[in-house]
Every structure is written in C-alpha cells, then in structure tokens.
Amino acid sequence: MAYSFTEKKRIRKDFGKLPNILEVPYLLATQIDSYRQFLQEERAAESREDVGLHGAFRSVFPITSHSGTAALEYVSYRIGDPGFDVKECQSRGLTYAAPLRMLVRLVIYDKDGQSVKDIKEQEVYMGELPLMTRNGTFVINGTERVIVSQLHRSPGVFFDHDKGKTHSSGKLLFSARVIPYRGSWLDFEFDPKDNIYVRIDRRRKLPATILLRALGFDTQQILDLFFDKNAFHFRDDGSVVLDLVPERLRGETAAFDIKANGQVLVEAGRRVTARHIRELGKAGVDTLEVPAEYLEGKIVAHDVVDTGTGEIICEANTELTAELVQAIQDAGVKQLDTLFVNDLDRGPYMSQTLAIDPTRTQLEALVEIYRMMRPGEPPTKEAAENLFQNLFFSPDRYDLSPVGRMKFNLRVGRDEVTGPGVLDNDDILAVLRELINIRNGDGQVDDIDHLGNRRVRCVGEMAENVFRVGLVRVERAVRERLSLAESEGLMPQELINAKPVAAAIKEFFGSSQLSQFMDQNNPLSEVTHKRRVSALGPGGLTRERAGFEVRDVHPTHYGRVCPIETPEGPNIGLINSLATYARTNRYGFLETPYRRVENGVVTDKVDYLSAIEEARYVIAQANARVGEDGRLMDELISIRHGNEFGMATPDKVQYMDVSPKQIVSVAASLVPFLEHDDANRALMGSNMQRQAVPTLRADKPLVGTGMERAVARDSGVIVTAERGGVVEQVDAGRIVVRVNDDETEAGEPGVDIYNLVKYLRSNQNTCMNQKPLVRPGDVVARGDALADGPSTDMGELALGQNMLVAFMPWNGYNFEDSILISERVVKEDRYTTIHIEELTCVARDTKLGTEEITADIPNVSESALNRLDEAGIVHIGAEVKAGDILVGKVTPKGETQLTPEEKLLRAIFGEKASDVKDTSLRVPTGMDGKVIDVQVFTRDGVEKDSRALAIEQAELAAIRKDLRDQERIFEDDAFSRLERALVGQVAEGGPSGLARGAEVTADYLANLDRKRWFEIRMRDEEANRQLEAVRAQLEAQRDSLERHFEEKKGKITAGDDLAPGVVKMVKVYLAVRRRLQPGDKMAGRHGNKGVISMIVPEEDMPFTEDGEPVDVVLSPLGVPSRMNVGQVLETHLGWAARGLGKRIGEMLEQHTKMQELRAFLDQVYNASGQKVDLDSLDDEEIKGLAFNLREGVPMATPVFDGAQEPEIKNMLELAGLPESGQATLYDGRTGEAFDRPVTIGYMYMLKLNHLVDDKVHARSTGPYSLVTQQPLGGKAQFGGQRFGEMEVWALEAYGAAYTLQEMLTVKSDDVAGRTKMYKNIVDGDHRMEAGMPESFNVLVKEIRSLGINIELEQD
C-alpha cells in the first residue's frame, strides 16, 4: 500500500483482520451534496432538474392575472458572487451569501386571451441566498451554523391500529392515514361498532361513505365496489335456489342439511370445514336449494323493483325480513342479489357505514364536509365544491411528492412507482379496500418506526420548502398587481417584491429549530454535528409527545443510524447520528452498502440497499469467515433476513456487510475495544469525546481505531494539498507550494498559497490554530496533510493525551470516580488549553451626543491607562486581569443643576471632567489573559482613528506579500520554461551584443536582465511565438493580481456596515490559558468520567520498579459495576505500545544496524492484523519512522475487529513487559511496595469542556429582580445563592435568630434595610436594622389582584 507523505512518518499498527473493501466515504457528503443539488449552480439553466430552487420556481410560476390577460413566466435564475469571503463575513458579523437573480418574462395577451400583445424580459433581484462553506456550514451574522437533517415520517399511506387502547374491551381499531408532503391529511378509522369513519386534518369524524358520495359514487356503486354478490333465484314452485360458490361457506354453521347427489354432506348445525368444501367441489355442486328463512338477515345488493308496477319494494343495502322476503316473492321477482358477508373474513363494514350515513346525494355530502371543515360558515354549492376540490385534487394545495406517490403505490400493491402528486378516486378506494382487508385479517399494519417509513430531509430540501413558502407569498401580491401591468406599462421588476422570500430564508437560517449554532469544541464535534439526524423540529415530533417506540433502536437502524450515539436526557433516541457508511438515496431514505454474494462466493461488488430492499435479502455479517477463494467457510452463518436475526447455509446468503464499523457512527467508531464496553457507557464515551478541549500540544492516541485520520481529514481543520508539488516556503502563518507542471493549467499561476488559521476563536471559545507539518523542499502529493489544526497530530485526530494510569485506591482521594493527577502533568502543560474570549465595545449615537472611544477618561489613574494606545485601545500582547480597561470610552452625561461652587470649579478647570461618564470596556470578573487581536470597525463617513488605519495597513501588507510571492513564483516558472525553450537555439539578434546566428546559452540568459529577454529575436518562429506568449501571460497575470489587490483594498478600506446608531465598534480578543486544576472534569473514551480531586506532587505518586511515577491514579471500583472493560484492555495495549516505542528509542540511541531495526519493526507491524510493506520505505524513511515511534508505536484496534487477548499478550512480551499487564508499584511517600501488583498502562484521557474556572462564582453586590427585589440567580447574571426553605429550617434548628433575620431581610429583599446597612458600614457603625421585606408587599399586591383588600396596620 502506498503511504502519503505524512502517513510514512508514523504508521499506525492495525490489528484488523478483515479486508478493507470500501474506504470510509467523505463524512460531510450528505450536507454538501444536498445543498449543491438545491443550488444546481454548476448546471446550465436548460439542463437543471426539477428540484431545489428550479423546482420551487417551476411550481409557483407562471402566475396569471385574474382576468387572464397577463402572465409572468419564469425563465431561469443565476447566483452571483458573494460580496465577502467566509473569513471576512466571520470577522465583520455578516452572512456569507450571494445575490439570487431570476430572469422573468412578462407576457401580455389581447382581450381574447389568445394572441400575444407584448413580451418583456427582465432580471429581478430575489434577495441574498446563504451559501455553504467548504466544510458544510453556513455563516449567519458572523457565526458558523449547521442545518441538522431531519428524520420525519415519509409521505404516503400508513395502516395502523390503536393497540387496543381506545375501547375497554381491548378490541383493535384499525385506521389508515394518507400523509402528503404538503396538504391535508386524510384518515380512515374503524369505531368499536365496526363502522368506518373519515377525518380530514384530524377534525370531527364523518362516516366514510360521505367522502365517497362527495366523489360522485351512489349507494349502488359503493356496494358494487366493496362487496361480492350471492344470487338467489325464486322458482315457480316457491323454492329458493342459491348460485353456490363452495369457498364462501367456509367457517359458517349450516342452517340446514347440505346435500350433494342426494347425500347429506353437512348436517344442520355443523360448521362447514375445508374438507366439506373440497367434497362439494368434487361433487360439482353449483346450486343449492335453501329455505326462504335463509334469506332473513341478508342485505340486498340492488334496489328490488316490482316489475308490474315499477314500485321499489326495498332499496339497496336493506336488511331482509320475513315480510320483505314474502313481498319480493309475491311481486314475482325472479332473481335477488345479496351482499356476501360473514363474521370470519368478509365483514359488512361498508354496508353498516352506509346505514348510518345521513346524506343521500353528492351535494349533501359536499355540504356536510364543508360544515365540518368550516363550522359556522353558511355553505353554498360553489363554496362546498371548491373547498372539496382544493383539499386533495388541486396541485397548488396538495402534493404527495414523488416519494409519497412511490410509497403509496407500493403499499396498495401497484407496480408503477410514478404518478400524479394529487389523489384520485382510485387512490381513495384503494386505501379503503386495503384497510378493510386488514380488518378482515388479510394484511399487516405498518411499523412507523421502520426506516422504510421514515425519511431524511436534508438542508437542500428544507431550504427549498422555505423558499417555496416565500414564493407563494410573493405570488399573491404579484397576481393583484398583474392586472395593472398592462394599463400602466409596468416592468417585471416593479411587479415583484422579493421581501417575503428574503424574510422566509433569513428566518429559516437564523432561527429555525434545525439551524443550530455549530458545536466547535473539536474537529470530531464539528463532523458529528453535521452528521446528526433529528426527529424534532418543524413537521417532526416533540419531546413531550414522543413515546418509547420512536426512541428505541429498531432492526432497520443497522448500518443506517448509530445504535450508540444519542444524547442522554429528554432527547434520547430522538437525536441520532448517521452510521459511518450510511447515505440517503434520491427519495431521502437511508441506505447502507453491502457486498454481493453469488453462490456462496463473496464478490467485491457493492450495492447500497434501503431498509425496504434489505428485508428481501439474506445478509451475512462482516466477520463471517471467508476463504482465500472468497467462499464462505462455515456450514451455518449468522444472518439477518426480514429484520430478524437467524442462521443460514452459505448458498442462501445473498449479501454481506462491508465492514464491522458500518453499524456505528463516527464518534463510536473512535472508541477502541468498543465491543468490550456496556452500551450505556459506550454512549457516554462517544458523547464525551465531542466535549474534549483541544490541548496546547496535541498527542495522538497510542491506542486508536484507524478512523482518526479520516475524521481529521474530513473535518476541514487540517490543511490538505489541493495539488501536488514542491514546498517552496513555510512559516508559522502560511505555506507556499510550487505546483507540478502536469497539474497546472496553461496561463494560471503554478503556485498554491495556504494561509494558516492562527489563534482564531471557535464557537465554544476554544482556540483554533494551525501548525505546518512540512518543510521547504518536501515533495507533496494531492491530498497530503500540510498543516495540523486544533486537536490533530500529524493529520490524525488527537483529542487528549496518553497518560500512565494505575488502577488503585490512594488515600480515599479517588472515591466516587475522583481522579488523582500528578503535578508533572501540570508542569509539562499536558492539559493546558487556550480559550479565546471576544469582548466588544460599541460607541453609539445617544440623545445627548456621540460616545467617544478615547484614552482621555475622567477620574482614572495613569497606571490604569498605561496599556492603552493614543486611540484608547489596548495594545496587542498586553497581559490584563479582571477590572483592567481594554477600550476607553466616555458617554455624554445629562446636564444637571450645578451649585455656584461647582460652576466656579468648572470655569477654572475646564468642562470635560463632569459632562461625560466613564463607560469603558473592562475585563470581566474572574478572567485574565493576553490580548491577541484587536479589530476596529468604523461606520461609513466617520473618520478612522490611528489604530484602525494601522490595522488596515497590516492587512494590506499581508495581501500584497501573498500576491508578490504568487507573481515571483509564476515568473520563475515562466522564465525557467523559456530558458528550456531558448537555450541551444539560434538567435537573429538580441541585447548585450548577441550576434546574429549565435546560439543562446544559459550563461548569456543568466547575466541578462529578465525584462530584456523579450528583446531577443529567434530564428525559429515557434520560439518567437513562445516568447510573445510568455510575455502576454506575465502581463495578464500582473494585471489580474493588481485587480485582485485593488478589490481587496476596496473592501478593507471601505467603511463598515454597522447596526443602526453605532458609530464605532472595537472587538478585543483575549487568550486565556487554563491549566489543569482540581474540579476540572476528565474522561477516557469508555464513559469513564470523573473530576480531579487533587494534584499530587510528583515525588508522592506511586512509581514503578524503574522509578517512573504514574501520571494518573484511577479507582478500580469504576470498572466492574460499569462493565466498561474496554478501558482495561486499552490500558494493557497502551503499555505495550509505549514499551515498544522505548525499545525502538534504545535501538536508535545505540545506532543499531538498519537490518535489525527493520526486523524489529517487521515483528511489531506484521505479527498479526493488516500487513505493512516496510520494504517500500527507504532507509531514511525507516529512520524517520523509527524516530517518530520513540514515544510509542500507535496501534489501531478497529471496532468489532480489534486486538484479541493473545495479540495483546504478544505485544507486551515483545515490549519486554509482564504479560499480566500488572506490575509492582511503590508508594512515593514511604518507598514501600504495595501489597499486590497493580494494573498499569497508558490510557488516552480527555479534558472536557466543563472547567471549574467557568463554574466557580461568588457574588459581592449585584443586580436585583425588579418585582421581588431579591438578588438574581446564576453566574451569567452575577447572581447569589438561593437560601431556601430547608436552609431556613437548619438555622431555625440551631436557633441562630440574628443570622436568620439577616438572611431574610438585609441580605435579600429589604430595600430600605440594605441601603441603611451600607450607610452604617461607611460610617463605621456595624449595626443592622431590619425593615419590611419586599416579598411582603408582593404578597399584599397579589392578594389585592384577586379582589381582596388587605392592609398592614402598624401601631
């Protein structure tokens, strides 16, 4: 296998046994592809598909005026260039968006509406459309946001029952529901009496036959559609004969003897069985004489008419009585059809429903539906018809969508998967038929938690829906104005007001429940957030109403949704994560890849199957044993079929899993030995990895899973080479790569400049910083890592640090999961993190004048101002602590009445001091740090201060430097190509005495000024043409760079677009260094979390035989009850990894022969698991590899395919460590050995973003609640601690009366008392006078608000 430039430097030993069939796909593809399809930017206007923006425009346009004389048609749209790039939008607090312009055509017809009178085309601006960044996020108002995908119930038809909960008898009441993509829901349901009702939009129920009547069916047609008939013939001799279909007698009790050929087959009172039916069939009985009483209770299928008089004896759907049977016989009716119903599998449901249906005609039915939908409005024929037509049959109001139509047709048993988006009569009849079949016991209800019935709605689709809503609002306004278009000669621009569209989009991206502030703690949390699937949100579930079934793991989640990663708490199971290989198909259903198996042989063909398709196949697991020839080896294999787990022989198997990690999500696949952890702890482990804070120096995990590189690569935090080439220049801030000739296109600069991100603030205030990995002269290929980002180490995800841990008690300090840490860890800054705080100071226009940012602040000492420059803004690099001034600002004060003395003082000492007050930006309490950046934004038309100009100059210089480098490398490249073309060619003449006919030499060119090269005239015309071409290229390149510079300069020097009333805004960024301290939360990757209880001096920590003190002491009681044994295995393997690293380090120090080093590395890498081709590396590369392995050989143990116990023992043995994984430890304080060997090794520990510094808080004096006058609560409000009921009881129990009085009065809500107290303290009189608490007044007012007067009478 070929290793990339960075992989070669440190190869991870992989214990995986299974072949890597499918690479881990691009992890952000779901988001990026969805939005790309929404925009269809790269496609030509005529070849765009009917989805996304194009689909939304097509569905709303053309808009025709009420009179029909004018129409506005949609032609195409185009998306412009964004005004600012992503970084500029983030720093200026803008939305990264591009203008959307739509080309429309206004067509005006003659009065007859046939011939075209006038056509006008014009481009109309439709507002700004947010664009997705390269990493799948949106920048909205300067902050990065993610639109989370939604898992919602797919449109289509669903059959269900109430699980026997509605009726006390526990009878199952079946129902059907037609859910459209947009429009009214249609429900059919049975009641306990087996009548069928219909509901529209969950309103009052009506008998279902009313809907059928409204569709135009009469009683006769309804009965014909839903029932088979039994024909009875009346003979002249008075006997009655039934046309017998033997099958219909099954399960009935014979009311009379059934005879065949004179023989009694079934005696009266006996139940007819399948054997009887077979005998009847054999005997060829097709008629059966029945007594007249047999007809009683049967239901008539048609109107029965007296042929003589034309009088209707009984109507269709009438139950026959003895009298009616007699009347029919008397009228001489020859044949009577009745409905075939029974209690077994042909219920009379439709007939019963017709009996309770009060309507008789179509109009009555329409009026009934109108009354139900619009209660209180008087119905008219037109209104009722319109309403009904618009409910399910109008494309504007109702759309099943292609998904809904596909699901609908498949569910009602049709083969065709396409069709119209609206319902028709056949659809409604098909739903009713299926519902009746299910009630009759023929058919299954649906499982709504099956992933074949839930689909994923991604960003693009949600944006399209919102856009369509905006367009529909525009449509209403345009239709009104279209009638004026002709008379007033309006242009399309004047007809369309795009505000509703812009507002809808802004609302969706800014404040939708699914548009979330991106979790940017570390690269993993970013990737996971973008791969999240939520069942909440508009059109989804709500936390309160979601039951257990929806939240539970379903068999169809296999390979689609992770069964482990979901939040704890009220959202458990409602917010899920996509599995590693999962993707959505064109209908939005999740699918997962499988390898095809043909005749027991596993192939490398991969098919993606959705949950519905998967149920049809027999699928083996990824770890099924496969021979060299690809045959499945075991006689019985563990398989899945139809959502059930079972066993099967190899010849039955049709598919096989692609990889064992396909069932879990990215975060869960980063947990080594996941298969040895309890599910609950695995859930905590995968969730806590997302909260890890990037440390100062990232440290790769010694024990990983092999997914680290993929996550780091796809998260976008590392810099990867876009094209291969040679590294030209590297410094801390940028990397310049000269691109390979074969990867550059003609005329473009063969240079890529990568500007690195330096100390940027993330959404969670963690620090984002990139560091170069390459050196000048390195040869890199496309996709190689050039620079590490936060929490990455050599292109691998590195969330924490490898710690030497011992599982043992230590003086009770690791009681209840507490963690004991060595001082060495703090000394070496292993867990020191940098947090960046953004503080903003805004100068506004006030009624009394403009606020001013200045260093001239009244009543402030010199020393407090010594960190500010002349503009009043703090210097970069200044170390500041709580209360220090960062930006000096003064606000005008209102004029006050002055005493004569004050007037005199002001006259003498000048105005300034007293008419302004100090409102400077100060460092908040509990914060200190270093100023790392300052940004100044000035409103257009306001003069910039010296600091703003200095910042501008620095930015322009950086851009100019980049462009100069680009120009220099481009020139070098062009002249080196020219040199190759000219040297050795014959010249016609040239500068510096180049004679005609002389040969151009390299020395001649080297001594000639490059600008004069173009004066050389060559004999070969091709060479002359090349000279001209290069000259033109260089000029074009210079012009383009100059234009680029001017464009950037324009943006930087222009005034800023600030909020109304804001004149100037200064943002100061503080870097706060947080060291590890007691109270910080730490965790491993197996859900083993705890809080640091104590930092122990290095010399007091337990140490090993060779004198190495451990870093962390964990409680051994944290393992058995939690059942996360993975942490112990990780510890063992980590110890082996570190031991092997030490041995390699010793070999390097002793300058061991290369052959021996290679042999040892071969033992390490190729003893088991995936093989590493060390022969492909040369000696220098092997040396570099060994050098990087000194700290430990990184291992990968993939989930469900990881290192086994013998392999771990083998590694420990190779490292020269005890196979038990335990060692004797000595007490650092006494030097004595502990009684028993202790489990010791290296575990990867994370520091989580729950830092004690952010939580500890104490109030001195602060704000009070307005009504109750009690102190506020919480750190954000600088609030106090609540002294509650139980605390009061405690003081009462001790009889501490004065303390209690103080707590309930002056320290809380006694307004007069607390001001008096302050005055007393100032006067040096430490007495307290308690007054009336404000809560008493609140109680009085509340009682008065109930209309009861209550007064306090004071003596």
From Swiss-Prot:
GO terms for biological process: DNA-templated transcription. Its EC number is 2.7.7.6. The keyword Nucleotidyltransferase applies. Disulfide bonds: none annotated. It catalyses: RNA(n) + a ribonucleoside 5'-triphosphate = RNA(n+1) + diphosphate. Gene3D superfamilies: 2.40.50.100, 2.40.50.150, 3.90.1100.10, DNA-directed RNA polymerase, beta subunit, external 1 domain, DNA-directed RNA polymerase, subunit 2, domain 6, RNA polymerase alpha subunit dimerisation domain, RNA polymerase Rpb2, domain 2. One of its GO terms (cellular component) is DNA-directed RNA polymerase complex. Keywords: DNA-directed RNA polymerase, Nucleotidyltransferase, Transcription, Transferase. PROSITE patterns: RNA_POL_BETA (PS01166). InterPro entries: DNA-dir_RNA_pol_bsu_ext_1_sf, DNA-dir_RNA_pol_bsu_external_1, DNA-dir_RNA_pol_su2, DNA-dir_RNAP_su2_dom, DNA-dir_RNAP_su2_hyb_sf, RNA_pol_bsu_bac, RNA_pol_bsu_CS, RNA_pol_bsu_protrusion. Pfam families: RNA_pol_Rpb2_1, RNA_pol_Rpb2_2, RNA_pol_Rpb2_3, RNA_pol_Rpb2_45, RNA_pol_Rpb2_6, RNA_pol_Rpb2_7. Belongs to the RNA polymerase beta chain family. NCBIfam families: PRK00405.1, rpoB. HAMAP family: RNApol_bact_RpoB. This is DNA-directed RNA polymerase subunit beta. It comes from Alkalilimnicola ehrlichii (strain ATCC BAA-1101 / DSM 17681 / MLHE-1). The lineage of its organism: Bacteria, Pseudomonadati, Pseudomonadota, Gammaproteobacteria, Chromatiales.
